Every structure is written in C-alpha cells, then in structure tokens.
C-alpha cells in the first residue's frame, strides 16, 4: 500500500464551546464524526485513526471498522491531541508524516488529503495546509478562517477576520495540517502563544515560533461545522446532495 510512512489522525473532542457535543450531532442519518471518518478513509491510508476523549465517539467509529485511540480530555488543542495519539500508534518509528484532519469537516474530499501528502513530501515546509480561493462576498467572518500568504504561498498570518483587508479574493483555510514528524514534536513542546489564544487558532503557535507553513491550493470548499448555524448549513447540503 502506498504512503506506509503516513498517518492520518482525526482529533475529536466531545465537548465544544460553541456547539454542544458537536461530534455526535446528526447530519442526515449519521453523526458528524462518522461522516468525517468515512470521507477521510477514502484516501486509503492504512494508519488512519480517530483520537478522542469519548467512549461514545470511540464506539461509533469502531462499529464502522475504524481505528480509535483514546486520549485525555484536558488536552488544549486538536494538534496536541493528534500528537498524543501518534505516540500510541504501534511501530510509529516508521511514520514520518502526520496528517491532522479536524473532526468538523463532514464533506472533506479525500483528494485534498492526498494532495497535501504529496505536497508535504515534495516541499521544504515544516507544515502544509490546504486553502481555497473565494470571493470576499461569499465568505463570512468569525466561523471561517482566512490566511494571508507571500508570493510563494508561504503563510504569513491566519485570522478569523477577513484578511488581507481590502482584497476581493481571499484564501479560505481548510482544517487539515500535514506535519513532518519533527515539526509536530516541536509544536507540542511550545507553549500556547498570545495570538493563538486571541484568535483561537493553534496554527499561530507555529508562525509565532518561526516555523514555516506552506499553503496548497485545492478546489473543494467543504463546510466546517463550528456553530449551530454551520450545522444547519451542513444538514441542508446533505439533504440537497
């Protein structure tokens, strides 16, 4: 099987500040976390896991044949949870790339994940992440994250505000991170930063500490479920497609 040195980890915390028991919310007939796992699993990566603090989430994934790693509930971010899970993967010395797919993207396309893997392997960035070009009018602030990049596509800043100011076309950030193993290990050794806490964006810890994030342009714009309104949009999308 290709990509034997890659692990995909989907961190899924039961309690969310903005949407109660978010992973267990139904979209159509199945839960949010089940939809995410099924989409990610289409990438056909052997080392694909859900990392969770919830037995209920674990049982849902196990029932559909998925692999689960149970983690503590007091882990600060999804990437920190990803690393805790990575340490528990058997024979993880053979894994050199870790893909963190946030557990709130129910319609993520597996081809975006595969593109990230290839881009990570063939670049010199510490971390890579996908972005999509969108019109300013089509994206709302607060529940969406945009990124400003340099001419080479290196990320300069991420924000829940629309950046850069005045631009008609923006880069919408998708919640997937491709880490080199040493970059992930460095990330979790660093303390949370002021900007990370202010924007509630863990990737700012990376930038504030001088590490590099490369952006990879993809075409799909999946819905990210962070609020009740996002959930309604996801349910509507599921019903219509």
From Swiss-Prot:
GO BP annotations, alphabetical order: CMP-keto-3-deoxy-D-manno-octulosonic acid biosynthetic process; lipopolysaccharide biosynthetic process
Cited function: Activates KDO (a required 8-carbon sugar) for incorporation into bacterial lipopolysaccharide in Gram-negative bacteria.
Primary site of residence: cytoplasm
Subcellular location: Cytoplasm
Name of the protein this chain belongs to: 3-deoxy-manno-octulosonate cytidylyltransferase
Protein family (similarity comment): Belongs to the KdsB family.
EC number: 2.7.7.38
Catalytic activity: 3-deoxy-alpha-D-manno-oct-2-ulosonate + CTP = CMP-3-deoxy-beta-D-manno-octulosonate + diphosphate
GO molecular function, one term: 3-deoxy-manno-octulosonate cytidylyltransferase activity
Top enzyme category: transferase
Keywords from the named record: Cytoplasm, Lipopolysaccharide biosynthesis, Nucleotidyltransferase, Transferase
Pathway listed: Nucleotide-sugar biosynthesis; CMP-3-deoxy-D-manno-octulosonate biosynthesis; CMP-3-deoxy-D-manno-octulosonate from 3-deoxy-D-manno-octulosonate and CTP: step 1/1; Bacterial outer membrane biogenesis; lipopolysaccharide biosynthesis
GO cellular component: cytosol
InterPro entries membership: Cytidylyl_trans, KdsB, Nucleotide-diphossugar_trans
Family matches, as HAMAP family: KdsB
Species, as recorded: Rickettsia typhi (strain ATCC VR-144 / Wilmington)
Lineage: Bacteria, Pseudomonadati, Pseudomonadota, Alphaproteobacteria, Rickettsiales
Gene: kdsB
